[in-house]
């Protein structure tokens, strides 16, 4: 499959996502790419207000990555097929054994600068507001000792809210913040995750 190779698992999807953004008249402004170190693997943690978040990150994050996403994404037309072809990791939240296996597969992907993208809220918001970040979403970062990169996406909820069947034209912004290492002490981790959430929220325009 496309996902069997770092290069071909990423670039076709990137081109596809950028073309979709151009065709659908949704220009994307990106800030903060200079915060990333070449060759370093990261765990990107983004807010999730719309299915369109997938197009924005896929097309404009500028890094080869695997996606950790919920099983339901498979069923979304075009999006699900492309993500499966790229070898992304689907999590079945209703089947813990399968979910743990998927997480192990995700960890194997984090080599040679390949990163992982997560939506710590676990699902799309129905209001446009950023929900609580779930601690389990950061498990890969703690086990692999990888830095978390908060990502703020703006405009996607207006372009494609849950109430609309299709997206509409609109301007989008993605801010890539400076990497953060999670604290080794679990007692401080909850506070740090909330700090990451606040960084994401403050970056939304």
What is each PLM-predicted segment?
Residues 1, 7, 11, 34-37, ...:
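Membrane-interfacial terminal anchoring regions of lipid-handling membrane enzymes
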Residues 1-14, 22-24, 37-96:
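Catalytic core of membrane glycerolipid acyltransferases/transacylases, capturing the structured
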Residues 18, 55, 138-139:
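Active-site phosphate/pyrophosphate- and oxyanion-stabilizing loops and adjacent acidic/basic residues
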Residues 20-21, 83, 109, 141:
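A generic structural signal for well-ordered alpha-helical segments
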Residues 29-31, 89:
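General small-molecule cofactor/ligand-binding pocket signal
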Residues 30, 44, 67-68, 174-176:
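Generic preference for hydrophobic
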Residues 34, 96, 154:
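Residue-level "edge-of-site" marker
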Residues 100-205:
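Non-catalytic C-terminal accessory region of glycerolipid acyltransferases
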């Amino acid at each position: 499959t496309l996902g069997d190779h770092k290069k071909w698992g990423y670039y076709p999807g990137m081109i596809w996502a950028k073309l979709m953004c151009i065709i659908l008249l949704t220009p994307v402004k990106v800030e903060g790419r200079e915060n990333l170190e070449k060759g370093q693997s990261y765990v990107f943690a983004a807010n999730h207000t719309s299915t369109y978040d997938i197009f924005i990150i896929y097309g404009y994050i500028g890094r080869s990555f695997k996606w950790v996403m919920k099983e339901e994404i498979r069923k979304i037309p075009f999006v699900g097929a492309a993500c499966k072809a790229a070898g992304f990791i689907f999590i079945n939240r209703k089947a813990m054994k399968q979910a743990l296996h998927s997480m192990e597969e995700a960890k194997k992907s984090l080599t040679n600068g390949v990163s992982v993208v997560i939506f710590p809220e676990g699902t799309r918001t129905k209001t446009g507001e950023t929900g609580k970040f779930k601690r389990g979403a950061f498990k890969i970062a703690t086990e692999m000792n990888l830095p978390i990169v908060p990502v703020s996406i703006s405009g996607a909820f207006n372009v494609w809210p849950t109430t609309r069947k299709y997206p509409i034209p609109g301007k989008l912004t993605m801010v890539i913040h400076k990497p953060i290492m999670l604290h080794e002490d679990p007692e401080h981790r909850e506070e740090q995750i909330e700090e990451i959430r606040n960084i994401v929220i403050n970056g939304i325009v």
